[in-house]
């Protein structure tokens, strides 16, 4: 009796659920076109993008030096209420003396 009940329930569940093929896949494009698409994107989008980025880095490296701006001691910038826990306490962690001023001005002036 229990076997009959299980088989009838499984038949009912099987009929109520239609068998759909992959609903999220694009049926018009097959898997054979997918490899061709990615190969095309690699050669015509990714590699030229890398080449343009390399050219940009090369041109920026030969651009030359920039003049740094004049130091103006604004009261709301570079506030030190307590020292940094490294070094002398006045330099930030990634301090660059040519670019980053201290509260009193640039170091190499």
From Swiss-Prot:
Keywords: Charcot-Marie-Tooth disease, Membrane, Mitochondrion, Mitochondrion inner membrane, Neurodegeneration, Neuropathy, Oxidoreductase, Transit peptide, Transmembrane, Transmembrane helix. SUPFAM superfamilies: Mitochondrial cytochrome c oxidase subunit VIa. GO terms for cellular component: mitochondrial inner membrane; mitochondrial membrane; mitochondrion; respiratory chain complex IV. Residues 60-109 are mitochondrial intermembrane. Residues 1-24 form a transit peptide. One of its GO terms (molecular function) is enzyme regulator activity. The chain crosses the membrane at residues 35-59. Residues 25-34 are mitochondrial matrix. Its main location: mitochondrion. Component of the cytochrome c oxidase, the last enzyme in the mitochondrial electron transport chain which drives oxidative phosphorylation. The respiratory chain contains 3 multisubunit complexes succinate dehydrogenase (complex II, CII), ubiquinol-cytochrome c oxidoreductase (cytochrome b-c1 complex, complex III, CIII) and cytochrome c oxidase (complex IV, CIV), that cooperate to transfer electrons derived from NADH and succinate to molecular oxygen, creating an electrochemical gradient over the inner membrane that drives transmembrane transport and the ATP synthase. Belongs to the cytochrome c oxidase subunit 6A family. It is linked to Charcot-Marie-Tooth disease, recessive intermediate D: A form of Charcot-Marie-Tooth disease, a disorder of the peripheral nervous system, characterized by progressive weakness and atrophy, initially of the peroneal muscles and later of the distal muscles of the arms. Recessive intermediate forms of Charcot-Marie-Tooth disease are characterized by clinical and pathologic features intermediate between demyelinating and axonal peripheral neuropathies, and motor median nerve conduction velocities ranging from 25 to 45 m/sec. This is Cytochrome c oxidase subunit 6A1, mitochondrial. It comes from Homo sapiens (Human).
